Amino acid sequence: MSSLLLFNDKSRALQADIVAVQSQVVYGSVGNSIAVPAIKQNGLNVFAVPTVLLSNTPHYDTFYGGAIPDEWFSGYLRALHERDALRQLRAVTTGYMGTASQIKILAEWLTALRKDHPDLLIMVDPVIGDIDSGIYVKPDLPEAYRQYLLPLAQGITPNIFELEILTGKNCRDLDSAIAAAKSLLSDTLKWVVITSASGNEENQEMQVVVVSADSVNVISHSRVKTDLKGTGDLFCAQLISGLLKGKALNDAVHRSGLRVLEVMRYTQQHESDELILPPLAEA
């Protein structure tokens, strides 16, 4: 490799509003493979940092790939500083993490980053599992979330199962889920969005519950029967985008849910097993 540095003028460095840290697939629409195009549709710039790189989700008959090595992962984060690409950074969002050591590396990076960006919004989707599947990450990840990432986050987006794992509390009814979410709030952690709270099965509704220190807001949406993957990643991408575009939290959550429903229906109309983003209509 030539020793000549072609691109060493940092004044020309690309800048991003968001750094998105989560999984990536070669084929499919989960993790950053759906989040990045969704964020860009909202007119925001994003850098994608992969935690795992997979051929596709495990729901196909072949499956390749795995977690990014720690040396590479820490290098990806370090390179953003070395390129001077974080001058305009406004938010970091995290999703599926490959290892507990990645979580520790990320937390150290975020702690240092916040010194230069004290108003940085950190949103954590603590991907651990769900009621149907149980825990589907490595068993040391839940404690790593509790120890390293939750103390840094302003907002988190667990499902009911993940809320139970993080708090050690039963959350199968609305009141207990709200109480568990409130137990996580702190001077830093301002809100919890429970993404799969108990809905009305008979009326085909699902609920998203927004919990903060002084309010609880229950948002109901139509339930769509589907096996599509990546809807949670899309929801978080829409949510962080809405917040950065100045939407209030409850409004951003409501709009994000509506967008996910729109994408799911559009995907079903096109008979695809992977999410397809229709054009985004500005409201």
UniProtKB/Swiss-Prot annotation:
It is an enzyme of class 2 (transferase). The keyword Oxidoreductase does not apply. Its EC number is 2.7.1.35. One of its GO terms (molecular function) is hydroxymethylpyrimidine kinase activity. Its cofactor is Mg(2+). Pathway: Cofactor metabolism; pyridoxal 5'-phosphate salvage; pyridoxal 5'-phosphate from pyridoxal: step 1/1; Cofactor metabolism; pyridoxal 5'-phosphate salvage; pyridoxine 5'-phosphate from pyridoxine: step 1/1; Cofactor metabolism; pyridoxal 5'-phosphate salvage; pyridoxamine 5'-phosphate from pyridoxamine: step 1/1. Substrate binds at residues 23, 59, 233. Homodimer. B6-vitamer kinase involved in the salvage pathway of pyridoxal 5'-phosphate (PLP). Catalyzes the phosphorylation of pyridoxine (PN), pyridoxal (PL), and pyridoxamine (PM), forming their respective 5'-phosphorylated esters, i.e. PNP, PLP and PMP. PANTHER family: PYRIDOXAL KINASE, PYRIDOXINE_PYRIDOXAL_PYRIDOXAMINE KINASE. This is Pyridoxine/pyridoxal/pyridoxamine kinase. The gene is pdxK.
